[in-house]
């Protein structure tokens, strides 16, 4: 067993405005879950934290559209997202909320620390004001034409088309997202500004040191922001919903009574506050995960996110933590993902493009989706979701390579050996070949997971399953049984042990199917850790690990094949196939 490590994992906080689509899932929460499961299966001390991101203009706009208060809307949507996460077997140790008191308190505290250290100041700025609405229009409350690419539905904080961050006053032909009014003025308003410029060199040094453990995508995005030069950014907004701006005594700050902190200032702080919620609810210690003078220097902190969140996590959030002057833990390893594309565009919550988590679960169980999204993870480049690709992955990898192997070997053991691990026979060339395959492939599988290369890990998992099928072709227990029962016994014994190995290594990606396999084989919980070894004989022993004479039972069919008619139906239902 490797030395136990303490690992903190966070995935980008899903925004509260509705069920997340499969692109959101594939770009943060799902790979973080797979990584958490792998680390737990190796005996490490893992804490996987996530939360709903509940502040900002989209929450207010969505609540208005439903006729609810923002609080009621967020309460309802939190439950929707929590249940969707459970449906996909996301193994959060805690799924918190940024609207809870812990996040308000910590956000206000960190802002005070930053101001004490000269990194926050009040500035008067020009902001969009809707005369007919009688209010300022921050962020997504204003829409218009992007000044960079000409996209006509750009929002005040970011253009969905080119991805550039925007200031509402930059939009061409702006209009109110609330009323549609174009009776717009530019007026002065006071806001808090985070003076990132003063942290430029420190953040550059930090990125250079930490970026060695990041994929090139994340490093390039961070360096792009740094190369362009960090600027002072407004961290307050003219909104009513959010973390209130307070003074050093915790009272409303004069002149800021109707303002809150910008959502991108408080949201990543939610990683810490959600961990505090977890600690309070479970009796655990949050400080050893987040404060380097309380043990967090011995914690590995791993973040997962889509590429659109990288700049905030590699620049803005580190400015907050490092600039506070307090011993906060910053990220060690960062995994950034590209987009999952949907027939010519990207998945989009606002435009209702693609398949959403609740819709997916109404079609098929979560393992089907988990396998396809991880085996097709958007790592080196964007990855296309297609119904045909989904069908091929399920039918080939899950139904054929894994499912048929489990079905064949367990049913044969039940019919010819009374459902018990055979006790006779001596291993031969086929078993030696299979042991060599395991000796080569199992360590490589762990290496891929350690490197957070999920497509390669899924491919290696499948390759191990495929090697097991090739082993059965070499061993031919059903042929040998006629004249050499002992020879057949060796093949069945090794085959059942392979089925257990296949179930164990499947646990991170397809946990439900893995549990069905391991339960049917009667594998105790304590024997479901990831297989490890250092010598050839360690891997040979895996083919004879289950006690001889142990009773097993064939599981039900693990995966149903996806029929062409289903692909046609789903294509029509969700609009796939239309470029």
Swiss-Prot record:
UniProt motif ('KMSKS' region) ranges: 346-350
GO terms, biological process: methionyl-tRNA aminoacylation
Record field: catalytic activity: tRNA(Met) + L-methionine + ATP = L-methionyl-tRNA(Met) + AMP + diphosphate
Comment on bound cofactor: Binds 1 zinc ion per subunit.
EC number: 6.1.1.10
Designated name of the protein: Methionine--tRNA ligase
Origin superkingdom: Bacteria
Record keywords: Aminoacyl-tRNA synthetase, ATP-binding, Cytoplasm, Ligase, Metal-binding, Nucleotide-binding, Protein biosynthesis, Zinc
Annotated localization: Cytoplasm
Record: residues binding Zn(2+): 146, 149, 159, 162
Binding site for ATP: 349
Cofactor: Zn(2+)
Motif segment ('HIGH' region): 14-24
């Amino acid at each position: 067993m490797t030395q136990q490590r303490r690992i903190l994992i966070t995935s980008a906080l899903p925004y509260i405005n509705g069920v997340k689509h499969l692109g959101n899932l594939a770009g943060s929460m799902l790979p973080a879950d797979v990584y958490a499961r792998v680390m737990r299966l190796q005996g490490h001390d893992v804490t996987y934290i996530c939360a709903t991101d509940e502040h900002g203009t989209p929450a207010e706009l969505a609540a208005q559209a439903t006729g609810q208060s923002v609080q009621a809307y967020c309460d309802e949507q939190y439950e929707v997202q929590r249940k969707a996460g459970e449906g996909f077997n996301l193994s959060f140790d805690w799924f918190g909320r940024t609207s809870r008191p812990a996040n308000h308190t910590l956000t206000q505290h960190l802002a005070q620390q930053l101001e004490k250290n000269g990194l926050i100041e009040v500035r008067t700025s020009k902001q969009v004001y809707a005369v007919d609405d009688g209010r300022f229009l921050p962020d997504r409350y204003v829409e218009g034409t992007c000044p960079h690419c000409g996209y006509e539905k750009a929002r005040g904080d970011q253009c969905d088309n080119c991805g550039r961050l925007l200031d509402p006053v930059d939009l061409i032909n702006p209009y109110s997202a609330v009323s549609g009014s174009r009776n717009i003025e530019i007026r002065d308003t006071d806001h808090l500004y985070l003076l990132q410029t003063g942290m430029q060199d420190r953040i550059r040094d930090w990125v250079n040191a930490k970026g060695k453990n990041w994929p090139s995508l994340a490093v390039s995005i961070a360096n792009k922001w740094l190369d362009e030069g960090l600027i002072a950014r407004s961290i307050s907004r003219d909104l009513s919903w959010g973390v209130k701006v307070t003074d050093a005594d915790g009272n409303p700050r004069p002149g800021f009574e109707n303002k809150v902190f910008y959502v991108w200032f408080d949201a990543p702080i939610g990683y810490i506050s959600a961990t505090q919620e977890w600690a309070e609810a479970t009796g655990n210690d949050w400080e050893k995960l987040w404060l380097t003078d309380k043990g967090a220097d011995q914690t590995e902190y791993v973040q997962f996110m889509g590429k659109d969140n990288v700049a905030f996590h590699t620049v803005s959030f580190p400015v907050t933590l490092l600039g506070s002057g307090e011993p906060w833990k910053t990220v060690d390893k960062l995994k950034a993902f590209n987009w999952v594309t949907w027939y010519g565009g990207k998945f989009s919550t606002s435009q209702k493009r693609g398949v959403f988590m609740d819709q997916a679960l109404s079609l098929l169980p979560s393992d089907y989706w988990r396998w396809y999204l991880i085996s097709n993870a958007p790592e080196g480049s964007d990855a296309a979701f297609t119904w045909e690709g989904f069908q091929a992955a399920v039918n080939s990898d899950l139904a054929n390579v894994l499912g048929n192997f489990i079905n064949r070997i367990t049913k044969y053991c039940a019919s010819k050996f009374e459902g018990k691990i055979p006790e006779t026979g001596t291993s031969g060339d086929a078993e030696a070949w299979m042991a060599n395959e395991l000796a080569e492939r199992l360590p490589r599988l762990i290496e891929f997971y350690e490197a957070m290369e999920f497509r390669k890990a899924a491919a290696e998992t499948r390759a191990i399953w495929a090697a097991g099928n090739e082993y059965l072709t070499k061993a031919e227990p059903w042929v040998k049984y006629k004249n050499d029962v002992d020879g057949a016994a060796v093949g069945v014994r090794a085959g059942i042990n392979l089925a257990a190995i296949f179930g164990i290594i499947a646990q991170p990606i397809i946990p439900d199917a893995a549990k069905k396999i391991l339960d049917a084989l009667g594998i105790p919980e304590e024997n479901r850790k990831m297989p490890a070894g250092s010598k050839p004989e360690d891997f040979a022993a895996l083919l004879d690990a289950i006690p001889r004479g142990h009773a097993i039972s064939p599981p039900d069919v693990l995966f149903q094949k996806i029929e062409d008619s289903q692909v046609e139906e789903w294509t029509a239902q969700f609009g796939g196939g239309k470029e």
